[in-house]
């Protein structure tokens, strides 16, 4: 007698397997078809600017990432609204779909109202299945892998962790990725290769030119400083 297709309740209760998740890296065909988002925090120490959280947005098609420091989780609503408006104006495209976990910050009425105002469809992951938001989860791991190295090598104090995270994402967006045929996320999004000439190591020494009123003719014309990241340009 064949037992190949025989199952009993006890066997199912004891041996129920977890179905594998889709290994596809991308399901989008154009930029901003799908954005992954997640919030990390609170940090054990506040940054220089008072931030203890940060939120990341990852475009599924280009793998380009945006990161924003926040003092409180409640700032997510305004941060996302500003981000969606930036995408709409700078790229002439709406965010069609947004995927996140089921945390209250994403399911509250005010956040849902903002999504509806932009016509964005919200996809929530099933409880206990962080793999469905895997792009954002892996991005956090990548960010922290890059954050630790400069903090340790440059001996930068922990309160500069927020600035280190911004620097890390700026760098990640300019590193070739096998997910997008070894192009950089920057090139995949902007359709032009990134400029590398201005990149510097986090925590390295730099010299800032002083304004004429900040020194006299016998004093130094620059000040020795520590490089902590790039301005928004």
Annotate each predicted stretch with a short phrase:
Residues 1-233:
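Anionic group-binding determinants
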């Amino acid at each position: 007698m064949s037992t190949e297709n025989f199952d009993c309740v006890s066997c199912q209760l004891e041996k129920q397997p977890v179905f594998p998740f889709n290994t596809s890296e991308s399901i989008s065909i154009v930029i901003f078809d799908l954005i992954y988002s997640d919030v990390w925090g609170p940090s054990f120490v506040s940054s220089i600017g008072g931030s203890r959280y940060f939120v990341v947005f990852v475009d599924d098609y280009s793998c380009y990432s945006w990161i924003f420091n926040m003092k409180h989780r409640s700032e997510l609503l305004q941060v996302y609204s500003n981000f969606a408006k930036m995408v709409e104006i700078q790229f002439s495209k709406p965010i069609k779909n947004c995927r996140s976990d089921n945390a209250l910050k994403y399911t509250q009425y005010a956040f849902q109202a903002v999504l509806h105002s932009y016509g964005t469809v919200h996809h929530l992951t099933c409880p206990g299945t962080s793999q469905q938001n895997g792009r954002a989860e892996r991005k956090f791991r990548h960010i922290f892998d890059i954050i630790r190295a400069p903090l340790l090598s440059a001996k930068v104090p922990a309160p500069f962790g927020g600035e280190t995270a911004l620097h890390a994402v700026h760098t990640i967006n300019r590193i070739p990725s096998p997910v997008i045929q070894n192009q950089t996320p920057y090139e995949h999004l902007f359709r032009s290769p990134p400029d590398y000439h201005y990149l510097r190591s986090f925590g390295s020494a730099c010299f800032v030119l002083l304004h004429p009123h900040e020194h006299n003719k016998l004093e130094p014309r620059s000040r020795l400083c520590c490089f902590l990241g790039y301005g928004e340009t």
